[in-house]
């Protein structure tokens, strides 16, 4: 726990030279919450560092931002934010992906990562106006290209194949074909952790650049 706090203190020192005092002030309750969850052994430092850097990016763009927020039955999102826009409020949900693959999936890491990403998009995007994934620049998200298309342009047969693949990994809660047909991925936030830099990319642009 002491090491967790020390790492976050160092991160805040780095951030203080890159963002405004207003952003730093808004990050304090996020820091407090993550330290509390670390006391309970519910979060890990590599994941929390990315949450804070991404939160600083969202806050600087006008979002009131929370971390590790309950969203529904047995669901918790990594980052949630809302801001005023011309037509009302805009809600964003961001999920952090570090690239972790469990030992039991050592022989099929790509399939595991692809179905994990698919599950995240299908399950979480329904709770937001804008849904994004964030990942470090040294990891490549395995985003199915079909999910970067608008719902009307998605091939039903391709989605059915993706659903079948997902069922082998995620059965509780299950993913439906309807969710795959209507879900949305609106942005990818690429994080350079060492210098606390965030670059927002369109999902199609991300796939073209990294895959």
Please describe what each predicted stretch is.
Residues 2-30, 34-38, 138-211:
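Non-catalytic C-terminal interaction segments of nucleic acid-processing enzymes
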Residues 72-78:
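Beta-rich nucleic-acid/ligand-interaction surfaces
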Residues 32-52, 70:
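A short, highly charged nucleic-acid-interacting micro-segment common to nuclease
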Residues 54, 58, 79-81, 85-107, ...:
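Conserved catalytic cores of phosphodiester-cleaving nucleases, focusing on short active-site segments
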Residues 64-68:
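A short linear hydrophobic-aromatic micro-motif
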Residues 62-63, 129:
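Short phosphate-binding/catalytic loops that engage adenosine nucleotides
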Residues 97-155:
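Catalytic cores of nucleic-acid endonucleases
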Residues 43-47, 51-53, 77, 207-211:
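Accessory terminal regions of nucleic-acid processing enzymes
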């Amino acid at each position: 726990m002491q090491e967790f706090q020390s790492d976050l203190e160092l991160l805040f020192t780095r951030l203080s030279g890159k963002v405004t005092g207003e952003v730093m002030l808004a990050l304090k309750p996020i820091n407090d919450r993550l330290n509390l969850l670390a006391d309970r052994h519910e979060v890990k430092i590599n994941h929390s560092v990315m949450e804070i850097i991404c939160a600083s990016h969202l806050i600087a763009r006008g979002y009131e931002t929370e971390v590790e927020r309950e969203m529904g039955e047995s669901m918790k999102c990594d980052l949630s934010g809302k801001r005023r826009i011309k037509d009302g409020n805009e809600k964003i949900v961001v999920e952090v992906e570090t690239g972790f693959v469990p030992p039991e999936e050592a022989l099929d890491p790509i399939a595991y990562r692809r179905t994990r990403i698919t599950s995240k998009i299908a399950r979480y995007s329904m709770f937001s106006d804008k849904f994004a994934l964030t990942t470090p620049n040294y990891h490549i998200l395995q985003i199915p290209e079909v999910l970067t298309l608008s719902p009307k342009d998605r091939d039903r047969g391709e989605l059915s194949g993706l659903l079948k693949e997902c069922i082998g990994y995620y059965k509780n809660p299950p993913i439906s074909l309807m969710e795959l047909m209507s879900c949305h991925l609106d942005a990818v936030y690429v994080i350079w952790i060492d210098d606390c830099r965030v670059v927002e990319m369109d999902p199609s642009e991300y796939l073209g650049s990294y895959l």
